Amino acid sequence: MGGGERFNIPGQHRNNLGKQINRQKLLERNNQKMNTSLSKDRVRGCGTSLAWQAMQNGVNNNNTRSSNQNWSAGFPASKNFFTDQDNQNYAGAKFSEPPSPSVLPKPPSHWVLLSCSPAEKELMSFQLKTLLKVQA
């Protein structure tokens, strides 16, 4: 009834070892290809690009402090950025103002008892409006 005994079969281990060796060889080949392609790019002239030269010159020169000071001069002042947006007309709803009572939805009929008098309905609508902070 048991699952039986497991036996070590030497043939399976050889297959796994072969797969591992093949994977290692593939990884080594890929690494060699990457290294040779990088060196070929440098020979072709990618290493002599303006960006590469600028980066090398930046490392050699100590002018980085002056470039950092000039960096902030290229951006507009934050005051101007926010005041320009305030002057624009915004056509959306203003949430600081309460909605008009005519816009408010009416409660479903099954929420309201059928035996309500008009005075009770007015009282309920008043309570609903005060809950919604609407001026009556």
From Swiss-Prot:
<keyword id="KW-0539">Nucleus</keyword>
<dbReference type="InterPro" id="IPR026780">
    <property type="entry name" value="PNRC1/2"/>
</dbReference>
<keyword id="KW-0804">Transcription</keyword>
<feature type="region of interest" description="Disordered">
    <location>
        <begin position="58"/>
        <end position="78"/>
    </location>
</feature>
<feature type="short sequence motif" description="SH3-binding">
    <location>
        <begin position="96"/>
        <end position="102"/>
    </location>
</feature>
<keyword id="KW-0866">Nonsense-mediated mRNA decay</keyword>
<keyword id="KW-0963">Cytoplasm</keyword>
<protein>
    <recommendedName>
        <fullName>Proline-rich nuclear receptor coactivator 2</fullName>
    </recommendedName>
</protein>
<feature type="region of interest" description="Disordered">
    <location>
        <begin position="1"/>
        <end position="22"/>
    </location>
</feature>
<feature type="compositionally biased region" description="Low complexity">
    <location>
        <begin position="58"/>
        <end position="72"/>
    </location>
</feature>
<comment type="similarity">
    <text>Belongs to the PNRC family. PNRC2 subfamily.</text>
</comment>
<feature type="compositionally biased region" description="Polar residues">
    <location>
        <begin position="13"/>
        <end position="22"/>
    </location>
</feature>
<comment type="function">
    <text>Involved in nonsense-mediated mRNA decay (NMD) by acting as a bridge between the mRNA decapping complex and the NMD machinery. May act by targeting the NMD machinery to the P-body and recruiting the decapping machinery to aberrant mRNAs. Required for upf1/rent1 localization to the P-body. Also acts as a nuclear receptor coactivator.</text>
</comment>
<dbReference type="GO" id="GO:0005634">
    <property type="term" value="C:nucleus"/>
</dbReference>
<keyword id="KW-0010">Activator</keyword>
<dbReference type="Pfam" id="PF15365">
    <property type="entry name" value="PNRC"/>
</dbReference>
<dbReference type="InterPro" id="IPR028322">
    <property type="entry name" value="PNRC-like_rgn"/>
</dbReference>
<keyword id="KW-0805">Transcription regulation</keyword>
<dbReference type="GO" id="GO:0000932">
    <property type="term" value="C:P-body"/>
</dbReference>
<dbReference type="GO" id="GO:0000184">
    <property type="term" value="P:nuclear-transcribed mRNA catabolic process, nonsense-mediated decay"/>
</dbReference>
